[in-house]
A protein has these predicted regions:
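The feature captures the beta-strand-to-loop junction immediately N-terminal to the Walker
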Residues: 37-39
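Helix-to-loop junction immediately C-terminal to a conserved catalytic motif
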Residues: 52
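ABC ATPase nucleotide-binding domain
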Residues: 7, 27, 63, 346-348
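Non-catalytic connector elements of ABC transporters
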Residues: 239, 249-362
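Conserved ABC transporter NBD signature motif
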Residues: 60-68
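ABC ATPase nucleotide-binding domains
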Residues: 33, 74-84, 88-231
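Conserved coupling/switch loops of ABC nucleotide-binding domains, chiefly the family-specific signature
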Residues: 58-61, 111, 211, 243
Length: 362
C-alpha cells in the first residue's frame, strides 16, 4: 500500500499558554491538491510551517512518503515552500533565482540551464530568464517563485497564501494556472488560504480549520453541499440559517416550526420532535413560486422584499422571513425583473435542498 504523501498525527503546538494546534491529524495522498482553509488565527499557517520544518510541534509526528521527518531540519525535508510574496532574491535574475537550489545541489551548468528553461515554459515565462525581479509584475513574480520551488522536484509543495497579494482578476487567472500546473506534474500540493473561492476552484479536498482543529475534511462539493456545522456552512458560501424546533417526523422527513411556519427537511439521524434545530438553505436553491407548478409541502416561504443587488451572474434579493429574519435568494435576472422593494415575494425550493442541523452545532 502506498504511503501518504503527508501524514500528520496528533499534532499540537503551544506558543506559551496559547494553543495554536489542538491534536490535528490529516493525510494527504500522492498527487493530491489539499487546501487548509480557515479564518485568521485558526492554525493553518502554523500547521504548514510544521510540515515545512520551520516550527517544531509540541506533540505529534509528521511523515512524508513514509519517512518520519518530525525531527529533521527544513533543508533536510523533501518539501519546498512558496510564500505569500514571492521572496525572490532581488540581486539575481529570474534564471538565477530558479536555478538557485539546483546550484546548491551541485547540478551541472548544462543541466541547470535546461531545467530553468523547462520551468520557464511550465509557468509561461519563456524569454524572461535574464530579467531582474524589479522588472516583473506581481503575477510574474509569483510564477517565478513557483518555478523556483518546483525546479528541484520536491515531493510535496507547500503554498502559504501565494495569491493573496494579487489583484482580483490576476488572482482568478493564477488559480486556474496553478491548478493546471499541479495536474500536469501530478505533484502533491498543500495550500493555505482564507479565501473560500480559491479552495473551491483548486482543491481535490479541503480541510476546514477552526480554533486550532480540523473541523471537516472533504471534496469541495461535499463540504459545500453537506457542511457538518453552522461554522462550515457560513465559511463556504452564503447561507440562510432558519432556527426553530422539530414538531414532527415522518420517516425520511422532519417538520420544523420556524417562527410559526412549518417547514420540511430531510431527517437528521439522532434528532427527534422537540429538539431545537437549524435549517440551512443556500440562496441559489431558492426560486420564485411558479403558479403553474406544484410545490413540495413545507418548502415555501413568503416575505416582503427588502433589498435587491445585481451581482452580474444573478440578482440577490432579500426578503423578511419568519420573525423578520433576512432570507437571501439568488435569482436569474429575468426572474427578478419587475420586482420592487415592498413586494410580497413567495419563494420555493426542492425538497432535498434544506440541510437540518442540531442547534448545539452553532
Amino acid at each position: 500500500m502506498t504511503a501518504p504523501a503527508v501524514a500528520i498525527n496528533g499534532l499540537a503546538k503551544r506558543f506559551g499558554s496559547a494553543l495554536a494546534l489542538d491534536h490535528v491529524s490529516l493525510e494527504v495522498q500522492p498527487g493530491e491538491f489539499v487546501s487548509l482553509l480557515g479564518p485568521s488565527g485558526c492554525g493553518k499557517t502554523t500547521l504548514l510551517r510544521i510540515i515545512a520544518g520551520f516550527e517544531s510541534p509540541t506533540q505529534g509526528r509528521v511523515s512524508i512518503h513514509g519517512q518520519d521527518v518530525t525531527d529533521l531540519a527544513a533543508e533536510q525535508r523533501p518539501t519546498n515552500l512558496v510564500f505569500q510574496r514571492g521572496a525572490l532574491f532581488p540581486h539575481m535574475s529570474v534564471g538565477m533565482n530558479i536555478g538557485y537550489a539546483l546550484r546548491l545541489r551541485r547540478w551541472s551548468a548544462v543541466r541547470i540551464a535546461a531545467r530553468v528553461e523547462e520551468m520557464l515554459a511550465l509557468v509561461r515565462l519563456e524569454g524572461m530568464r535574464d530579467r531582474m525581479p524589479g522588472q516583473l509584475s506581481g503575477g510574474q513574480s509569483q510564477r517565478v517563485a513557483l518555478a523556483r520551488a518546483l525546479a528541484a522536484e520536491p515531493k510535496v509543495l507547500l503554498l502559504d497564501e501565494p495569491l493573496s497579494a494579487l489583484d482580483l482578476k490576476l488572482r482568478e487567472q493564477m488559480q486556474l494556472e496553478l491548478r493546471a500546473i499541479q495536474r500536469k506534474l501530478g505533484a502533491t500540493f498543500v495550500f493555505v488560504t482564507h479565501d473560500q473561492t480559491e479552495a473551491l476552484v483548486m482543491s481535490d479536498r479541503i480541510a476546514i480549520m477552526q480554533g486550532g482543529r480540523i473541523v471537516q475534511t472533504g471534496s469541495p462539493q461535499d463540504i459545500y453541499r453537506r457542511p457538518n456545522s453552522v461554522f462550515v456552512s457560513g465559511f463556504i458560501g452564503q447561507t440562510n440559517l432558519l432556527r426553530g424546533r422539530i414538531v414532527g417526523q415522518d420517516g425520511a422527513r422532519s417538520t420544523i416550526d420556524v417562527g410559526g411556519v412549518h417547514l420540511s427537511a430531510p431527517t437528521l439521524p439522532g434528532m427527534a420532535p422537540g429538539d431545537a434545530a437549524i435549517l440551512l438553505l443556500r440562496p441559489e436553491a431558492l426560486r420564485l413560486r411558479d403558479p403553474g407548478r406544484a410545490e413540495v409541502a413545507g418548502c415555501a416561504l413568503e416575505g416582503r422584499l427588502t433589498d435587491q443587488v445585481y451581482l452580474g451572474h444573478c440578482v440577490r434579493i432579500t426578503i423578511a422571513g419568519p420573525g423578520g429574519i433576512p432570507l437571501f435568494a439568488d435569482l436569474r435576472e429575468e426572474e427578478a425583473e419587475g420586482l420592487n422593494k415592498g413586494d410580497i415575494v413567495a419563494l420555493v425550493w426542492a425538497g432535498s435542498s434544506p440541510i437540518l442541523m442540531k442547534e448545539d452545532f452553532a
